[in-house]
């Protein structure tokens, strides 16, 4: 396995199939003597199902996923310093409901404030500089208000995440294999492929995660793979023809499954048989 071209690629959580039960997966992994962990993530996130629930536990789980995508992993890139400070303030307020929001730069520094900053922004300023910005952000979003409601703060962060074009996406790290046609040759070798309600997103795996292309599921004509490769036949509207994208990945089966799951979910939600 170590000699495989995909061996060094980061692996992302594998979405469970609809028919999988956690207990069965737990038993299977235990028998295989493999290290594993479960990661909570809503598998299918459609716009028409994005509203808050009356169940506070459900909202809490959705919040944790949004916080992870925005702050812990940075999968949803935040593009402005102002928004970074506001999101960090919300995250801190939710994490410290009993202690209350820190009221000074020193108090914020003492809670290791960089841990509340998205990875691509974390090292651009000192902890003291971020703390000063977060104090301002907290005032703008009400995170430091004495009567701040925890549920409202969570919903504010969820709202920010849900407006992102990549919200709800499942991400897979891949190497590009083929060099033709031109649209493929222009892509870097290392890619991050995401699938959400809007379709397939192709990003540069380098720092900054530059967006390269997005294709709706109607543009993905065929897909499939083996244990080490995944290929897609995609319609390119600009040249009015299809092209093949061949990728090296250890998660071909996971990618194939989430495409099908999203297509089925979209068809069911729109009443298409």
Regions found by a protein language model. Name each.
Residues 1-34:
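Eukaryotic mixed-charge, acidic/polar low-complexity intrinsically disordered regions
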Residues 4, 19, 38, 164-165, ...:
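Intrinsically disordered, low-complexity segments enriched in small/polar residues
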Residues 18-23, 27, 44-45, 53, ...:
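Short amphipathic alpha-helical surface micro-motifs
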Residues 67-69, 74, 82-83, 87-273:
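N-terminal recruitment modules of adaptor/scaffold proteins
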């Amino acid at each position: 396995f170590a000699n495989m071209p995909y061996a060094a690629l980061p692996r992302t959580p594998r979405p469970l199939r609809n028919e999988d039960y956690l207990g069965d997966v737990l038993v299977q992994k235990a028998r295989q003597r493999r290290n594993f962990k479960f990661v909570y993530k809503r598998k299918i996130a459609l716009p028409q199902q994005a509203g808050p629930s009356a169940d506070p536990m459900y909202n809490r789980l959705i919040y944790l996923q949004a916080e992870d995508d925005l702050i812990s992993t940075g999968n949803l890139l935040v593009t402005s310093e102002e928004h970074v400070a506001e999101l960090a303030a919300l995250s801190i307020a939710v994490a410290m409901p009993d202690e209350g929001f820190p009221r000074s730069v020193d108090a914020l520094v003492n809670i290791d404030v960089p841990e509340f900053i998205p990875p691509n922004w974390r090292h651009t300023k000192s902890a003291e500089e971020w703390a000063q910005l977060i104090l301002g952000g907290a005032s703008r979003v009400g995170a430091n208000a004495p009567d701040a409601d925890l549920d409202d703060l969570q919903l504010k962060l969820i709202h920010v995440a849900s407006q992102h074009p990549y919200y709800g996406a499942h991400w897979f790290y891949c190497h590009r294999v083929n060099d033709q046609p031109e649209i493929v040759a222009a892509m870097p070798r290392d890619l991050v492929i995401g699938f959400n309600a809007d379709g397939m997103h192709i990003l540069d795996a380098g720092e900054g995660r530059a967006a390269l292309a997005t294709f709706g599921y109607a543009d993905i004509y065929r897909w499939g793979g083996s244990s080490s490769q995944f290929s897609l036949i995609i319609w390119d509207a600009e040249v009015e023809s299809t092209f093949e994208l061949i990728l090296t990945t250890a998660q071909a089966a996971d990618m194939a499954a989430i495409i099908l799951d999203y297509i089925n979910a979209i068809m069911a939600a729109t009443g298409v048989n």
